[in-house]
């Protein structure tokens, strides 16, 4: 995940989820965008990348190619839009083929299984999908707020709102909805043979390489999240 509003996403750090009798914890790693890799091998065993409230035009062509290759090989990309949709999508046109539209407040009613969710009024971007037949809307809310596409061996999810939205962050149903958004990826994570001490060491080693290559005066910030068994 890349974000210029890291502090507004800190609520995700340490969030626990129960999926298929397994406990998962989201752990955020904050890094500078200039350190986003250009070699897909440097992404190692990261479970997912979230881009939210970030100007993707700041990424180089080599970084975009790396991200695309990582998703193609089986990675999961999550993209938050909302009021920042235009800048978030600006550098991802070739990968997503999604255009930002007008932003308006939309009242979402979430499915009854999300006991604490109920409804929420969120700033929402109208999204236009050039390849609409490749996307499916999740049966999470009415109207739909999450769209998902299978991309080769990987997966891309686009939200009509931003996870940095103040209303969403303060909403009592927040954690339930976040869990639903990431549930499929977490379930796949539970079945991956590399989840264990050895793979966790590999992830930490990869992150160590990122952290030792930082440039201190870069304006854009980001986060990677790692999901591991608790």
For each feature predicted by the language model, list its residue ranges:
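Ser/Thr- (and often Asn-) enriched beta-sheet segments in non-cytosolic proteins
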Residues: 27, 99, 107-109, 148-150, ...
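A short acidic, often aromatic-flanked loop/helix-cap motif at beta-alpha or helix-coil junctions
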Residues: 34-41, 103-106, 144-146, 166
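A glycine-rich, often tryptophan-bearing local segment used as a flexible ligand/cofactor-contacting loop or short
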Residues: 56-142
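Aromatic-Pro/Gly-enriched surface loop or interdomain linker
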Residues: 1-54, 81-83, 187-191
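A glycine-centered loop/beta-turn motif at secondary-structure junctions
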Residues: 45-48, 73-77, 126-229
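Short secondary-structure boundary/capping segments
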Residues: 15-19, 92-97, 173-175
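Short catalytic/ligand-binding loop motif for oxyanion handling, primarily in non-cytosolic enzymes
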Residues: 9-10, 85-89, 166-168
């Amino acid at each position: 995940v890349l974000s210029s509003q890291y502090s507004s996403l800190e609520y995700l750090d340490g969030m626990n989820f129960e999926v298929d009798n397994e406990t998962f914890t989201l752990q955020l790693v904050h890094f500078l965008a200039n350190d986003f890799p250009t070699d897909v091998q440097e992404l190692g065993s990261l479970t997912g990348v979230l881009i939210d409230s970030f100007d993707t035009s700041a990424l180089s062509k080599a970084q975009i190619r790396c991200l695309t290759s990582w998703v193609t090989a089986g990675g999961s990309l999550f993209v938050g839009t909302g009021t920042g949709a235009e800048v978030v999508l600006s550098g991802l046109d070739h990968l997503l083929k999604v255009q930002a539209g007008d932003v308006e407040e939309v009242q979402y009613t979430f499915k009854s299984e999300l006991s604490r969710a109920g409804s929420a009024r969120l700033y929402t971007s109208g999204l236009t999908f050039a390849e609409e037949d490749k996307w499916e809307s999740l049966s999470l809310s009415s109207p739909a707020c999450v769209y998902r596409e299978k991309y080769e061996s990987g997966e891309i999810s686009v939200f009509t709102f931003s996870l940095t939205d103040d209303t969403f962050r303060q909403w009592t149903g927040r954690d339930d909805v976040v869990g639903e958004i990431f549930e499929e990826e977490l379930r796949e994570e539970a079945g991956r043979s590399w989840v264990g001490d050895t793979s966790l060491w590999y992830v930490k080693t990869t992150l160590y390489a990122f952290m030792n290559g930082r440039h201190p005066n870069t304006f854009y910030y980001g986060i990677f999240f790692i999901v591991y068994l608790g």
